[in-house]
Structures are given as structure tokens and as C-alpha cells.
Amino acid sequence: MSQSFYNESSSNQTNFNQQHSLNHGGHEMMDMHEAIGEIIAGMNQAIILRPQVKDQELLSILDRQYNFTLGMYNTIVESFKTGHDPSVPTGRYQMDTGNDFKYGLTPGQPKKPMQNANEINDEAISGFLLGAQKGVAKCMTAAATETTNPVVRRVVADSIPNCIEMAYELSIYQNKHGYYQVPQYSQQDMQTMLNAYDTTSNPLH
């Protein structure tokens, strides 16, 4: 009697786990594969580029972001495979730098594609890392809007701000070193655009 009850309970638990792990729509499966693949590509890129980094500040950013992304990857994959809450919840990435941008353009040499792999430098590496973070953020945003599994949707949606934060940190690094210049409109044009909209208070009843 007790053995039969145990077998039945075990079978029910197995069916429950299978139902959760298979609780995914077709669009979700395709978008999640693309998003996870994008995360892997970014991590692989960091591993390849790391030995070429010269600046210790950039090396610190690369290591910190890679280690955080590793945990994020495991959390996403676990929730995707099981359909359950992951054993390690989504973390929050904390930048280790300020958030001040330098505005304005300084003339410099025109940019052009590299002719030789030996031309790799910190400007190019930080650009590759920034592009990877932007790519992951875009893929996960698309995946979150197509996801039917509630756990996976929440985990992916909660991970997007971390990708944005990591991309922001890299853009600050690039701006600081003159790799990523930020132009501005004139003060008059800025005021015109800032005042182009106003708040409203007309809710539906």
C-alpha cells in the first residue's frame, strides 16, 4: 500500500515536472534559442578578446561582466529547461564606475576597418563587448514578449536591465577614452525638443 502510494506520488511529481518543462510555445522556443545563443556568443567573444586587452580598467570591466553574465546564463538556462524558479535568482549588476558622459565632438582620424589582426586594440575590444551587450538586450527583449512560460518570462525580463547596465558601463568607458563621442544639439534646439510634450490627467472612466 505504502509502496503503491510512493510510486503514484513519484509518477505524479514526474508528470508535474514534465508539464512545467514543456510549458513553452513555439515562438518562445525559437526566441529563447536565439537569446541564449547570443549570450554564449558574447561570452565566447570575451574569452577570445581577454588576452588582447591592454588597459587594466577595461580588463576589470570584462572580468566583472563575464562573471555576472555566467551566473545570468545559468539562471536563464535552468529556468528554461525546468519551467520552475531557478535555484539562483536573477541578480542585479552594479557598475563600478561613475555615470558622467563628456559631451561634444573632437575631430580625429577617420575610422576604417582593420587590415590586420595585429591592429586589435582596447577601442575595438570595448566596441565588440558593447555590441555584444546590445545584441543580448535586444534578443531578450524580443524573447520576453513572446514567452508563454511565466517563470521564464519573468527571469528573462528581469535580466534585461542588467544587459542595459553593462552596455551603459562600456559606453561610459568608451566615452571617457574618446572612443565614443556624444554630440549635442544647441541649447535652443534642446529646449524646443524637451518642451515638445506635456503631461496629462485624463484617465478613462
Question: How does the language model describe each region?
Answer:
Residues H27-R50, G104-D158, M166:
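Acidic/histidine-rich alpha-helical segments that form the ligand environment
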Residues M1-M43, R50-V53:
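Leu/Val/Ala/Ile-rich N-terminal alpha-helices, chiefly Sec-type signal peptides and the beginnings
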Residues T69, N162-C163, T192:
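Hydrophobic alpha-helical segments
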Residues S9-N15, T82-S126, P183-P203:
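Carboxylate-rich helix-loop segments that flank metal/cofactor sites and access channels
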Residues D55, N149-V152, A196:
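Short, surface-exposed linear patches
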Residues Y6, Q56-G104, A167-H177:
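Conserved alpha-helical segments that form or flank metal/cofactor-binding pockets of metalloenzymes
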Residues Q3, Q13, Q18-Q19, Q45, ...:
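Residue-identity detector for glutamine
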Residues N149-Y185:
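A contiguous, mid-protein "functional segment" used to position or interact
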